[in-house]
Amino acid sequence: MTHIENIPHILQNGITHTTSEYANPDFVPIGDGSLITTRNNFILNNGTRLGEYIPFYFGVRTPMLYVVQNGFNLVAPTSAENIVYCVSSVQKIIDLQLDFVFTDGHAVDGFSSQYTVADIQNIDTILDKNAINAKYWKDENDLDKKRRKEAEFWVLGDISLHAILGYITYQRKCKKQDNHLWCRCYQCSY
């Protein structure tokens, strides 16, 4: 998920890291800065830093989207019209032979486990798809639901434009740039 103002750069360079030679000099951040710092320094089981990876959620309507839109945790609110989901797939990342890890919950939560390409054949049993697809994550009968809803897929390094299958935004009016339609209309706002 990214700010709509980052899309022109993504269309030219793919999704890039701040340390990439192709990094967006005009990057517009969204999200909790303190969490981003924590993630950047979090060491994965394979010895790499989580900050070296590009994050994806498995579902929409995530707690992060809620925080970004509503401005909690010292995060400035960003309107739904300015938020874009960059969509890829596990299969596409595998086909492009990109290195990745995935988690069964929020990546920096101590209860979450990390998995690699060696575990991918079991992804359907590892992930809790009911929690991932749930509209609400607060559940008095399941206090771990929010963590599982935030299961993540992390791709190492920059992601080329070829790995991006589409874009989802709340906007009803799609835009064209360089003769490519770059947003699909879909309502996933809170």
Residue ranges and their predicted role:
Residues 1-190:
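Active-site-proximal loop/hinge segments that shape catalytic or ion-binding/gating pockets
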